[in-house]
Amino acid sequence: MSDKFGIDGHKLAYHPVEVARLLEAENDVSKLIDIYPIYVEVSPVGACNHRCTFCAVDYIGYEATNRIEADVMMRVLEDMGSNGVKSIMYAGEGEPLIHKQINEIVAKTKEVGIDVSFTTNAVAMNDRFIENSLQHTSWIKVSLNGGSAKSYAQVHQTREIDFQRVINNLKKAVEFRNKNKLNCTIGVQSVLLPENADEMVNLGKIIRDEIGADYFVIKPFSQEPSSINRLYEDIDYRSMTLRANEKRLKALESENFKVSYRSGTMSNYHEDQENRYTTCYSTPIYMAYLMAEGSVYGCKDHLLDPNFCYGNINENTFSEVWKGERRRRGIEYVLNELDVSKCRINCRMDKVNRYLFDLKEGRINHMNFI
């Protein structure tokens, strides 16, 4: 299957200057602390309109009062843009489109030179967002985890009516994008689960033929160690029952529609720990996570862990937080104390970490034969 959008890999190799700075620093914290993240995930709000059965951040609590104020975010964006942050994904522990000033935030993000993306359930995607923010957005990935209203409602723990609402919202977005010749990629992502495995082909047809989206991603579940839910903790992607439709999904591809069935990532879920990296070199260097209550973290899979929290944008500027003493201690902790065998398997930075570990530890065979 085609991976036109690089979904089942990483793009750090296209940032050689940043990679060179990491290699040249040689674990010198005084040098590493000067490297700003390439990518930041921002949670505009803590509230969410769904309670997905696989949600990794259920332990945060979906706090409706947690919200980044627009004026604070504008200041943070100027700081990030002037210090080399290149991209922001609005997602997080809540549903980003619920934020009432999200369109103003998106416009400001693009204004300061930062690329914009969204991961959303798209229930709250309205005409105002489509007409104002699509033009500033590089891509939108919609979490849609059922091929029927019944299974969708079961997995998302919402009303069945939301299934058709999301389809209609996406159709509007694609039509507006095409009519106005906007450069915004629109795709759908599903977590492969026992409840929806038999419906993935049907969902793929809806995405391709009814919605007209650009791609469909089918990815494995990954247990977040801190999550309250343990429903899929023992899921086994070596099962042919779960993966029976892989070839039929591949057959859905066309020139304008791509399917990314993340079989490699599924295999990694059951990989021998001895083959994994033993140091997380991407954290807290190349990405940051901004919680809805304002805290800045170096890793999205260690939220509420003080070893990964460096400060709060409601109390200090982003630069003050990122170059502060708490992050300095955080870098030292990751390099010297973090046991990655206890981290989430297939985390957001997994492919980046594999790449960096091979570079740092010299694990690439015949590297000079380019």
PLM regions with names:
Residues 1-64, 81, 266-275, 285-287, ...:
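N-terminal pre-core extensions flanking Radical SAM catalytic domains
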Residues 51, 84-85, 136, 211-212, ...:
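Short loop/turn motifs at secondary-structure junctions
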